[in-house]
Swiss-Prot record:
Keywords: Cap snatching, Endonuclease, Eukaryotic host gene expression shutoff by virus, Eukaryotic host transcription shutoff by virus, Host cytoplasm, Host gene expression shutoff by virus, Host nucleus, Host-virus interaction, Hydrolase, Inhibition of host RNA polymerase II by virus, Manganese, Metal-binding, Nuclease, Phosphoprotein
Protein's UniProt keywords contain Metal-binding: yes
Statement: the UniProt record of this protein carries the keyword Nuclease: yes
Name the UniProt record assigns to this protein: Polymerase acidic protein
Short motif Nuclear localization signal 1 (NLS1), span: 124-139
Name of the coding gene: PA
Pfam families named among the record's database cross-references: Flu_PA (PF00603)
Enzymatic class: hydrolase
Length: 716
């Protein structure tokens, strides 16, 4: 523990803690847990005070380090960490100048803004128990108490937390990091169990007379005398407290807190049934691109011009035919729809002048595919409320589906590197503050790791398709507009490249509400034979439309080219979020940043450079049946990004529910791993809530399978 403390804390804090222990005649070689506790408390007091100043107008402001304004008056006077004589001198001086009441015990800080002393507490136990002990010891309404715990909880007098949320979050993050570092070295258990309650003068002396009456009068409500209150605090059981509170709520509520042990949790039950099918709005790993390098044609950048130019690069077109029919659809209509697209593109070329947009003829096959005139007629409720058997039409329960291997393959593919660059480094002006320099350095390192990633391609593809579809839905509400599915990238050599994945035909789109649906037919190129995994393509009709010559080790080989066609739909709100998919980059960057922050706070310097440039170090990526998978920092970046992208591509109520409910179980398991002796009630109900979200969604089923792998290895 002593070695850990010297590594983990600033040398100045360690020195102050050594002095304090010497002053109280304690041996830090023996009382190592106390040594760690004093250092932690000192650091929290310093962090509490950091960056907080009072300006000339007497207002509290936050100023980062290295700021020329740091000559402003400090908002907090730090009393903790001074020797006793000096500390009391400071307290007396404050009382004389501010008129504050002199405290009986040495407080930790004085707040010049609120004009009050502050007692800071850091506890390994329940915050409210420690708060009561502190309040009982101080017995002064003038001293403000603020308690932090290692689990992120806090409690303060009258729920007045003094600091802004961000400053308190820094303290909580640091405490959580210390706890994790201790746990990883096997020190946390002993440290947690070594905490003793606040020693008070009352425990050493018999209290009589006036003092006794005052003690009895200053108890919390519902306690008649000091003995009762002492007995309550000594015998306080948080789990029993929760049970009692629940039983007060209702006679029907009867919760018994059961201990949560390694043998308690069972795996999550995944549903049986036929394998799940692909439900993303566009093809992922199976997509094929027709591309042009260094585009410089007339009208370059206009989607229809780009699409026709890309189509001209392929010469292997042939008479299309259905190779994998859609079980419930009219497959000849899908075939006719593709032929219509080819014919209308040919008409454009024959005319010589390419229009900016193309509206398809409203043929019977497109009307069928886009559900034209299929929606039931809407009738005003007032006109039919007197009908006796009026009811909402029955909808079938979704059929249960089982997990299939294709979704894991999709995820693995999303984490891989491609041979193209999908995002540019943002051009940002020079940094003016150290924190900006660190932030842009992190962003640049992260961008370098993910710019070639396939998940980044999916982001740019999703942004383009959703933007184009939303624009067309608003600009051409009654038209069946042809929308090319395009993306732009750069080759490794830096040459620009335009890619065509296929086409979308949009249906009627009078979208008044956010959730109103626009139907569309997607037609996407692929080299994947659908007959290899027919269950994956349940919702598609697949045509063979040509033969493509590919370079291979044995020379050129010819491969059949397929077109994956399906009817689909989306809404304004879904398209709006699809246009925002770049946020996935930000989310995964923030996750990486929190890893860097944890590392930096232990080493007490910014570890960004070492983090990304130490290629020999491996990091945990996730769980698999084999155990904890590890990889380079680049692999971690790409895996986190792919998870974020798949959460966007496969967003659904099932995913929302599973994420929220499984997180509760995850927290309990984490608490067990940290030896926090968690207790639960109605664990069966929690499993039920998790499992009712496992219906047919491939991404949710995969996450549930990963969760089971985590359970297996976490509880060994």
């Amino acid at each position: 523990m002593e070695d850990f403390v010297r590594q983990c804390f600033n040398p100045m804090i360690v020195e102050l803690a050594e002095k304090a222990m010497k002053e109280y005649g304690e041996d830090l070689k023996i009382e190592t847990n106390k040594f760690a506790a004093i250092c932690t408390h000192l650091e929290v007091c310093f962090m509490y005070s950091d960056f907080h100043f009072i300006n000339e107008q007497g207002e509290s402001i936050i100023v980062e380090l290295d700021d020329p304004n740091a000559l402003l008056k400090h908002r907090f006077e730090i009393i903790e960490g001074r020797d006793r004589t000096m500390a009391w001198t400071v307290v007396n001086s404050i009382c004389n100048t501010t008129g504050a009441e002199k405290p009986k015990f040495l407080p930790d800080l004085y707040d010049y803004k609120e004009n009050r002393f502050i007692e800071i507490g850091v506890t390994r136990r329940e915050v409210h128990i420690y708060y009561l002990e502190k309040a009982n010891k101080i017995k002064s309404e003038k001293t403000h108490i603020h308690i932090f715990s290692f689990t992120g909880e806090e409690m303060a007098t009258k729920a007045d937390y003094t600091l802004d949320e961000e400053s308190r979050a820094r303290i909580k993050t640091r405490l959580f990091t210390i706890r994790q570092e201790m746990a990883s070295r096997g020190l946390w258990d002993s440290f947690r169990q070594s905490e003793r309650g606040e020693e008070t003068i009352e425990e050493r002396f018999e209290i009589t007379g006036t003092m006794r009456r005052l003690a009895d009068q200053s108890l919390p409500p519902n306690f008649s005398c000091l003995e009762n209150f002492r007995a309550y605090v000594d015998g306080f059981e948080p789990n029993g407290y929760i049970e009692g509170k629940l039983s007060q709520m209702s006679k029907e509520v009867n919760a018994r807190i059961e201990p949560f042990l390694k043998t308690t949790p069972r795996p999550i039950r995944l549903p049986d049934g036929p394998p799940c099918s692909q439900r993303s709005k566009f093809l992922l790993m199976d997509a094929l691109k027709l591309s042009i390098e260094d585009p410089s044609h007339e009208g370059e950048g206009i989607p229809l011009y780009d699409a026709i130019k890309c189509m001209r690069t392929f010469f292997g077109w042939k008479e299309p035919y259905v190779v994998k029919p859609h079980e419930k659809g009219i497959n000849p209509n899908y075939l006719l729809s593709w032929k219509q697209v080819l014919a209308e593109l040919q008409d454009i070329e024959n005319e010589g002048k390419i229009p900016r947009t193309k509206n398809m003829k409203k043929t019977s096959q497109l009307k069928w595919a886009l559900g034209e005139n299929m929606a039931p007629e809407k009738v005003d409720f007032d006109d039919c409320k007197d009908i006796s058997d009026l009811k909402q039409y029955d909808s079938d329960e979704p059929k249960l589906r089982s997990l299939s291997s294709w979704i894991q393959n999709e995820f693995n593919k999303a984490c891989e590197l491609t041979d193209s660059i999908w995002i540019e480094l943002d051009e940002i002006g020079e940094d003016v503050a150290p924190i900006e320099h660190i932030a842009s350095m992190r962003r640049n390192y992260f961008t370098a790791e993910v710019s070639h990633c396939r998940a980044t391609e999916y982001i740019m593809k999703g942004v383009y398709i959703n933007t184009a579809l939303l624009n067309a839905s608003c600009a051409a509400m009654d038209d069946f507009q042809l929308i090319p599915m395009i993306s732009k990238c750069r080759t490794k050599e830096g040459r620009r490249k335009t890619n065509l994945y296929g086409f979308i035909i949009k249906g009627r789109s009078h979208l008044r509400n956010d959730t109103d649906v626009v139907n569309f037919v997607s037609m996407e190129f692929s080299l994947t034979d659908p007959r290899l995994e027919p269950h994956k393509w349940e919702k598609y009709c697949v045509l063979e439309i040509g033969d493509m010559l590919l370079r291979s080790a044995i020379g050129q080989v010819s491969r059949p080219m397929f077109l994956y066609v399906r009817t689909n739909g989306t809404s304004k709100i879904k398209m709006k979020w699809g246009m925002e998919m770049r946020r996935c980059l930000l989310q995964s960057l923030q996750q990486i940043e929190s890893m860097i922050e944890a590392e930096s706070s232990v080493k007490e310097k910014d570890m960004t450079k070492e983090f990304f440039e130490n290629k020999s170090e491996t990091w945990p990526i996730g769980e698999s049946p084999k155990g904890v998978e590890e990889g380079s920092i680049g692999k971690v970046c790409r895996t986190l990004l792919a998870k974020s992208v798949f959460n966007s591509l496969y967003a659904s109520p099932q995913l929302e529910g599973f994420s929220a409910e499984s997180r509760k179980l995850l927290l309990v398991v984490q608490a067990l791993r940290d030896n926090l002796e968690p207790g639960t009630f109605d664990l069966g109900g929690l499993y039920e809530a998790i499992e009712e979200c496992l219906i047919n969604d491939p991404w949710v089923l995969l996450n549930a399978s990963w969760f089971n792998s985590f359970l297996t290895h976490a509880l060994r």
